[in-house]
Each structure stands twice: as C-alpha cells, then as structure tokens.
Amino acid sequence: SYDYNLFIFIIFLFFSVDTILLVYITRYNIINDAMPVSNVVFLFSKFCSMVGIAIILVTIPMVLGVIIQLLKGHTDFNFSVYFIELYVLTLPGFIQMILLSFAVHLLVNNKFGGHGVSMIIWVCLFLLRSFGEMDYNLFFYFYTPNYRWSDMNGIGHFLEPQLWFNFYWISLGCLLIVIAFLFYQRGI
C-alpha cells in the first residue's frame, strides 16, 4: 500500500503541474487568456480532471483484487469493505494530495520549482512523522488516526474520526487553494 501511495503521489505531483501550466508550455496561453471565462472555471475543471484520475487509480486495485480472487477460486466478496476502504478512506487522502499539489504549483508558478517545493513539503512531513517524537495528527497534513477492521463489526467506531479528519484536511486544502488562487495571475 505504501509503494502504491508513493506511485500515486508522483503521478499527482507531475500531472498537477502539467494541468496547470500546460497552456504556457504549449504556448496556448495567448488564446486562453483572451477567453471571457473566469479563472475559477479553468482551475476547477483541471482539479476535477485530477479527481477523476484519482477515482480511476482507486478503482484499479479493487478491480484487480477481485480478478485475482476469482482466479484463485474465492467467490465470497465483501464489496462494502472495498467501497469503504477505497472510496471513503483512501480517496479523500488522494484528494488532499491533489489540493496541496495544486496550491503549491499555483503559488510557485514554475514547473520545476513547484516540483521541488512539493517534494520538500512531503519529505519534511514524512521525516517529522517518522523520526520525530510528534504523533499529533492535527499537525501533519494528510495524516489521520489509525484504524482496524474486524470481522465482527467492520470498521466500527474508527470510521467517524477518519471522516472528521478527512473533512478537516480537505477543508484546509480548499483554504490553501483559495489563498493560492488570490495570487494566481492569468495573462502574464
């Protein structure tokens, strides 16, 4: 799971800058800047495309897992567990990655500078969380409390804290996007 999340992070890091700065890379910005459409429409459509990629990348492990289980002869599927784990618990984390990556790239407005700043942020978060003495989930962006599945009651009482933390971090990511959007300049 950790390797797959690292792979997802790299995809979001590179695709987010390409979606934001593609009009400048392809020199389409002269036409794009003359369009009478708000910046919000352009950026929201790019964000929605990244969320669509996140949904596809969350669905792939479920489909492959079901296929592998079928090939091994297992037919007792628990799709509610798959749905909760992937779409309710994992997908919001991917959306948080997208929000932070978008905010950084909107503020930096440079392809490689945005990559560098994003990587520094994520490496610092990982190092502080892994080697530091702090285990405070409200301090580290994207982190949520641990949870366990059980056969008797599923995720049980662990679901509510997960939902609240995901709401908290997505709200902070939206705030970062709004702040970055205030500094975003179109036409330059």
Language model features with spans:
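Cytoplasmic membrane-interface regions of multi-pass membrane proteins
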Residues: 25-32, 101-107, 181-188
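Terminal transmembrane helical anchor/hairpin motif
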Residues: 112-187
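Hydrophobic alpha-helical transmembrane segments
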Residues: 1-24, 63, 179-188
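Transmembrane helix-loop junction
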Residues: 22, 35, 66-70, 106, ...
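Secretory targeting signals
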Residues: 1-14, 44-112, 148-152, 158-161
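Gram-positive cell-envelope targeting signals
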Residues: 29, 43, 67, 83, ...
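Helix-loop-helix units of permease transmembrane domains in multi-pass membrane transporters
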Residues: 17-53
